[in-house]
């Protein structure tokens, strides 16, 4: 059974504190927007889909008991606080897209004279709550599409009708802890396992925050999947000797040309995969694709505190006084990406903008 990172019922929200994993499993109450901003910014919840869901649900929890004198005041509350939540971690686009969609809904309901202020509030609550179910459904579709693409690639490359079990590599954490459930890149791994086609999964430690060692390894052990943890610096050696069939990672933001911002270290894995002829896939829902930016050059890269590099917990591991550069993300050029796995199919980076535009017009 997948782990549950988000617990929600109307008026109540709790998140699994990911800073304490894998040693302690503790849920934190999120009582409103300030709590939501803090748990996102401090990375007690992380993963682009989960950030958006927790951010929006934190507002739903806050406005649930409130009474509003007018639709205008409710709209102002929604718009102001959603924009504030976007600032918690700006690289991940899902929160921004979700905020824009909910603000658009609020504006439309404000203009509709047939809708009362209470009806407007209920519509908003239902819209935020629907994000949970949709994310899980989207993740399952991503998992199925990604597994199919990897197995088809292996079958074609080896000249067989049906591929046998495969070995894959993943980076950072893209599973139930990063989403509403099931996961994106880790959803692909789960689907391979469900099909009986997963021989082994390798996960990187993902320095400096160790999401792979702390979170992905935790999920894989929890589900008893055949898995091995490797250091970030071992990837080239791994791809050379372990017959890895594919690399599959998540995304915090995908530009219109397919350039992808993901956890720091993703870019170098893509370079190494290209050298070894290993297909490199990005698994991301449509909410992680930002057609408004033409390339990765326009993606804002969050820089995290030095302490995340110099300390593990309370223990210093770097020399006092050393300067640090700690970007949380890097951008993998589209030229290194084999395919972008979405809930609607797998797209070549060069075809992404056209295909996604078609889907959005439906």
UniProtKB/Swiss-Prot annotation:
- Site (Transition state stabilizer): residue numbering on this chain: 172
> Active site annotated at which positions?
252
**In which pathway does this enzyme or protein participate?**
Amino-acid biosynthesis; L-methionine biosynthesis via salvage pathway; L-methionine from S-methyl-5-thio-alpha-D-ribose 1-phosphate: step 1/6
Q: Which SUPFAM superfamilies match?
A: NagB/RpiA/CoA transferase-like
Q: Which GO terms describe its cellular component?
A: cytoplasm; nucleus
The record's catalysed reaction(s) read:
5-(methylsulfanyl)-alpha-D-ribose 1-phosphate = 5-(methylsulfanyl)-D-ribulose 1-phosphate
Q: Tell me where on the tree of life, at the top rank, the source sits.
A: Eukaryota
Which residues constitute the signal peptide according to the record? none
Q: Where is it localised?
A: Cytoplasm; Nucleus
The family classification in the record reads: Belongs to the eIF-2B alpha/beta/delta subunits family. MtnA subfamily.
The UniProt entry, under HAMAP family, shows: Salvage_MtnA
| UniProt cross-references to PANTHER family, sorted A to Z | METHYLTHIORIBOSE-1-PHOSPHATE ISOMERASE
The protein's name is Methylthioribose-1-phosphate isomerase
Source taxonomy lineage?
A: Eukaryota, Metazoa, Ecdysozoa, Arthropoda, Hexapoda
């Amino acid at each position: 059974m997948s782990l549950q990172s988000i617990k929600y019922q109307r008026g109540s929200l709790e998140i699994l504190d990911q800073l304490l994993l894998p040693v302690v499993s503790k849920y934190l109450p999120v009582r409103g927007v300030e709590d939501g901003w803090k748990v996102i910014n401090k990375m007690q919840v992380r993963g682009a889909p989960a950030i958006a869901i927790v951010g929006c649900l934190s507002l739903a929890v806050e406005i649930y008991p409130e009474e509003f004198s007018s639709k205008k005041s409710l709209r102002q509350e929604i718009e102001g606080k959603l924009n504030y939540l976007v600032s918690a971690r700006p690289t991940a686009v899902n929160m921004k897209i979700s905020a824009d969609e909910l603000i658009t809904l609020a504006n439309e309901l404000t203009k509709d004279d047939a809708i009362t202020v209470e009806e407007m509030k209920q519509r908003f609550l239902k819209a935020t709550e629907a994000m949970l179910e949709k994310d899980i459904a989207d993740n399952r579709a991503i998992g199925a599409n990604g597994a199919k693409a990897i197995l088809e690639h292996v079958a074609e490359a080896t000249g067989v009708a049906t591929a046998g079990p495969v070995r894959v590599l993943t980076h950072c954490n893209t599973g139930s802890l990063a989403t509403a459930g099931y996961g994106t890149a880790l959803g692909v791994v789960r689907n391979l396992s469900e099909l009986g086609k997963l021989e082994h999964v390798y996960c990187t430690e993902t320095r400096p925050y160790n999401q792979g060692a702390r979170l992905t390894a935790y999920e894989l052990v929890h589900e008893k999947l055949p898995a091995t943890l490797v250091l970030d610096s071992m990837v080239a050696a791994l791809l050379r000797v372990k017959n890895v069939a594919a690399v599959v990672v998540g995304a915090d933001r995908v530009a219109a040309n397919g350039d992808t911002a993901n956890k720091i270290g993703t870019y170098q894995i893509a370079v190494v995969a290209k050298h070894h002829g290993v297909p490199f896939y990005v698994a991301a829902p449509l909410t992680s694709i930002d057609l408004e930016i033409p390339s990765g050059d326009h993606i804002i890269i969050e820089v995290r505190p030095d302490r995340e590099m110099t300390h593990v917990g309370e223990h210093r591991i770097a020399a006092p006084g050393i300067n640090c550069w700690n970007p949380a993300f890097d951008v993998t050029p589209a030229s290194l990406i084999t395919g972008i796995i979405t809930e609607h199919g797998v797209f070549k980076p060069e075809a992404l903008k056209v295909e996604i535009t078609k889907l959005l017009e439906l």
